[in-house]
UniProtKB/Swiss-Prot annotation:
This is Polyubiquitin. Ubiquitin exists either covalently attached to another protein, or free (unanchored). When covalently bound, it is conjugated to target proteins via an isopeptide bond either as a monomer (monoubiquitin), a polymer linked via different Lys residues of the ubiquitin (polyubiquitin chains) or a linear polymer linked via the initiator Met of the ubiquitin (linear polyubiquitin chains). GO terms for molecular function: protein tag activity; ubiquitin protein ligase binding. Belongs to the ubiquitin family. Ubiquitin is encoded by several different genes. UBI1 and UBI2 genes code for a single copy of ubiquitin fused to the ribosomal proteins eL40A and eL40B, respectively. UBI3 is a polyprotein with one copy of ubiquitin fused to ribosomal protein eS31. UBI4 is a polyprotein containing 5 exact head to tail repeats of ubiquitin. The lineage of its organism: Eukaryota, Fungi, Dikarya, Ascomycota, Saccharomycotina. InterPro entries: Ubiquitin-like_dom, Ubiquitin-like_domsf, Ubiquitin_CS, Ubiquitin_dom, Ubiquitin_ubiquitin-like. Residues 1-76, 77-152, 153-228, 229-304, 305-380 form the Ubiquitin-like domain. Its main location: cytoplasm. Residues 381 form a propeptide. The keyword Signal does not apply. There is a cross-link at residue 76 (Glycyl lysine isopeptide (Gly-Lys) (interchain with K-? in acceptor proteins)).
Length: 381
């Protein structure tokens, strides 16, 4: 069948393909016609960047479909990785490399399996699926490599009565695991335990190594008295959820309860009270949230952000987007909200008309940026 590939210069290339062709094959055909190396090609269809190993039929690309070709400038760069022994490793990477890719490169150089590597930049532990550009890691940035050692150690837990409990743990144990070990020894249910280290309340899903808890560290155990209260959580759709909580509950705990009720992952939740966004490690009592208080829940799309779109009538529309969304995606979201077909929309930012195949990040459109929407009258340009 025939498909079309449109470049940013406006040129359209026609390719003969089969639905079983992979995206790699298509990139090779483009190289044959245009001389552009596959590793500099990004192909976009229906607002999605296409992955090399997938086939055209995987993406439901049919005859006479149009793909958009965006060039990936050779964006090789060097970064440094510093180990705890003080050794510095130099890596050749691209901003689009994922943290997994970087760990594989470290394995190639140093022989350390990726699952024993933790990479830190600007004080943050880097997540495998994210890219270097997601973390704004630029050329000659230095990452820190911490090894996740296999193997156990002892830690101490001190109660308010002054009693000290000794536990056998591993750095990869989660706080939940530690609470279960305390329950085994002392019979205290995990939901009545609050663990404190270095002045911080420890969150259940995190590991000991996340908090830099090492052998012979001492944690403090505070009991959470039963004696709950009800609070309300109001969503943007106007729905109100009732939760049973305690003043000593952390914001993380509250988000977990919302997940149990509504199925919304905590990392997509933003909670607002008295105009303030609530921070995960803090407790309800830190914010003076009392019984029958109402919190507001705003959804955070993955890696998402809000942008505004202003129409000529002066109306402003708020959209939840991601930097990797293409202009097509944004037009579809506007259609969902306002009913305006994408082909009648022209979007302007910083005086430039935005092109469909490009992404928000291509135009450096960041959270709370304002785009302008101009309607394209039928029959005109």
């Amino acid at each position: 069948m025939q498909i079309f590939v449109k470049t940013l210069t406006g040129k359209t290339i026609t390719l003969e393909v089969e639905s079983s062709d992979t995206i790699d094959n298509v990139k090779s055909k483009i190289q044959d016609k245009e001389g552009i190396p596959p590793d500099q090609q990004r192909l976009i269809f229906a607002g999605k960047q296409l992955e090399d190993g997938r086939t055209l039929s995987d993406y439901n690309i049919q005859k006479e479909s149009t793909l958009h070709l965006v060039l990936r400038l050779r964006g090789g760069m060097q970064i440094f990785v510093k180990t705890l022994t003080g050794k510095t490793i130099t890596l050749e990477v691209e901003s689009s490399d994922t943290i997994d890719n970087v760990k594989s490169k470290i394995q190639d150089k140093e022989g350390i399996p990726p699952d024993q590597q933790r990479l830190i930049f600007a004080g943050k532990q880097l997540e495998d699926g994210r890219t270097l550009s997601d973390y704004n890691i630029q050329k000659e940035s230095t990452l820190h490599l911490v090894l996740r050692l296999r193997g156990g150690m002892q830690i101490f837990v001190k109660t308010l009565t002054g009693k000290t409990i000794t536990l056998e743990v591993e750095s990869s144990d989660t706080i939940d695991n530690v609470k279960s070990k305390i329950q085994d020894k002392e019979g205290i249910p995990p939901d009545q335990q609050r663990l404190i280290f270095a002045g911080k309340q420890l969150e259940d899903g995190r590991t000991l190594s996340d908090y830099n808890i090492q052998k012979e560290s001492t944690l403090h155990l505070v009991l959470r008295l039963r004696g709950g209260m009800q609070i309300f959580v109001k969503t943007l759709t106007g729905k109100t959820i009732t939760l049973e909580v305690e003043s000593s509950d952390t914001i993380d705990n509250v988000k977990s309860k919302i997940q149990d009720k509504e199925g919304i992952p905590p990392d997509q939740q933003r909670l607002i009270f008295a105009g303030k966004q609530l921070e995960d490690g803090r407790t309800l009592s830190d914010y003076n949230i009392q019984k029958e208080s109402t919190l507001h829940l705003v959804l955070r799309l993955r890696g998402g952000m809000q942008i505004f779109v202003k129409t000529l009538t002066g109306k402003t529309i708020t959209l939840e987007v991601e930097s990797s969304d293409t202009i097509d995606n944004v037009k579809s979201k506007i259609q969902d909200k306002e009913g305006i077909p994408p082909d009648q929309q022209r979007l302007i930012f910083a005086g430039k008309q935005l092109e469909d195949g490009r992404t928000l990040s291509d135009y450096n459109i960041q959270k709370e940026s304002t785009l302008h929407l101009v309607l394209r009258l039928r029959g005109g340009n």
